[in-house]
C-alpha cells in the first residue's frame, strides 16, 4: 500500500509517537538513541528523510527491560507498547510504541493488528572479543530466522515449494512442526533470544550489539560511542543520537551526508491494511478485504 497521498499525515502521526516515547523516557529516566534512517535524518535533514516511512530507536537492554515492565501497569493514553510477550500474533522480537487509535497490518503472511508505530530495538551487551561477538550474532540470526519461519503463514503452494530446493528443506521442516505447535515453538524461540540477550552485563561490556538489526556485523560496535547522547534538531523537536554520532553513522553508512541515488529513495516497509482514523477488529477488517 502506497502512502504518498497521506505522507504528511503519516509523518505527523509517527512524529507524535516519537514525542510520546521521548516523554516516557524522560519521565522514567530511560536511555535511548535514534538509529538507522532516523539518525541519518536527524544529522542530515534535521528531521525525517523525505522518503523514509518509519522511526527507529535503540534502548540499552536494562532500560528496554524497564520500559517493558513499566508498560505492564502504566497507562500511556492512546499509546501502547506492543511486545512479543503481550501479543501472541506479534511476529517480531523487538517492540513498538503503537498508536492504538490507528490500524495497521504490515504483512498478509504475518497477520498482526497493530497501529502506526515507532520501532524500539534492544541494544545488548556482547563479548569483548570481536570474533566471539560475531559468532553470537550468527546464533541470534539463526534463531530469528526460525522465528520468522514459525510466524509466517504461507499459502499451500509456497509451503510445498520449499521442498524444491535442498537449502529450504530445514525451513519446510520448521513450518511443518509449526503448523501443529506454532505457539509453543514461538515461545521457545523467544526464550532462547532472551537467554542470549542477557548473557553479558551491559554495564561491564565494552561492545554492544543490535541483535535484530539489518546491518550484519556492523551491528556490533563499541559501547563508548553511546555516551549520554548528543542532541539534534528533528522537525519541531530534538532527539538524541549516540554521543559519538559521526563515528557511529560512518561505521554504518560511510558518507552519510551524501544522498543515495534517486532510484534508492523509496519507502521500504510493507502495509497490507491501513486505517489512520481508528482501531478496527479482525471482523471489521475482513469485511473490507
Regions found by a protein language model. Name each.
Residues 22-55, 59-65, 224, 251-252:
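Active-site nucleotide-donor binding segment shared across nucleotidyl transfer reactions
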Residues 129-135:
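A short secondary-structure junction signal
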Residues 137-142:
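Short, His- and charge-rich active-site/binding loops that engage polyanionic ligands
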Residues 2-26, 68-128, 146-164, 168-254, ...:
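Conserved catalytic core of two-metal-ion nucleotidyltransferases
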Amino acid at each position: 500500500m502506497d502512502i504518498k497521498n497521506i505522507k504528511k499525515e503519516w509523518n505527523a502521526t509517527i512524529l507524535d509517537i516519537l514525542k510520546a516515547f521521548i516523554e516516557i523516557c524522560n519521565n522514567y529516566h530511560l536511555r535511548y538513541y535514534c538509529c538507522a534512517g532516523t539518525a541519518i535524518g536527524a544529522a542530515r535533514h534535521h528531521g525525517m528523510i523525505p522518503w523514509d516511512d518509519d522511526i527507529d530507536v535503540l534502548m540499552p537492554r536494562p532500560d528496554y527491560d524497564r520500559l517493558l515492565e513499566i508498560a505492564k501497569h502504566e497507562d500511556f493514553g492512546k499509546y501502547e507498547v506492543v511486545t512479543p510477550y503481550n501479543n501472541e500474533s506479534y511476529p517480531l522480537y523487538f517492540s513498538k510504541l503503537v498508536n492504538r487509535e490507528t490500524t495497521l497490518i504490515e504483512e498478509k503472511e504475518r497477520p498482526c493488528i497493530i497501529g502506526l508505530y515507532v520501532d524500539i530495538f534492544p541494544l545488548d551487551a556482547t563479548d569483548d572479543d570481536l570474533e566471539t561477538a560475531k559468532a553470537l550474532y550468527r546464533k541470534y540470526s539463526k534463531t530469528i530466522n526460525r522465528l520468522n519461519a514459525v510466524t509466517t503463514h504461507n499459502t499451500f503452494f509456497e509451503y510445498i515449494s520449499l521442498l524444491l530446493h535442498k537449502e529450504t528443506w530445514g525451513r519446510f521442516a520448521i513450518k511443518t512442526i509449526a503448523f501443529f505447535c506454532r505457539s509453543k515453538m514461538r515461545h521457545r524461540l523467544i526464550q532462547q533470544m532472551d537467554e542470549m540477550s542477557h548473557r553479558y552485563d551491559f554495564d561491564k561490556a565494552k561492545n554492544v550489539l543490535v541483535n535484530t538489526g539489518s546491518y550484519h556485523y556492523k551491528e556490533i560496535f563499541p559501547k563508548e560511542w553511546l555516551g549520554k547522547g548528543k542532541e539534534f534538531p528533528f522537525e519541531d523537536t530534538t532527539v538524541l543520537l549516540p554521543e559519538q554520532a559521526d563515528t557511529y553513522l560512518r561505521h554504518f553508512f560511510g558518507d552519510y551526508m551524501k544522498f543515495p541515488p534517486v532510484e534508492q529513495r523509496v519507502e521500504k516497509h510493507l502495509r497490507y491494511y491501513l486505517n489512520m482514523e481508528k482501531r478496527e477488529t479482525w471482523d471489521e477488517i475482513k469485511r473490507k478485504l
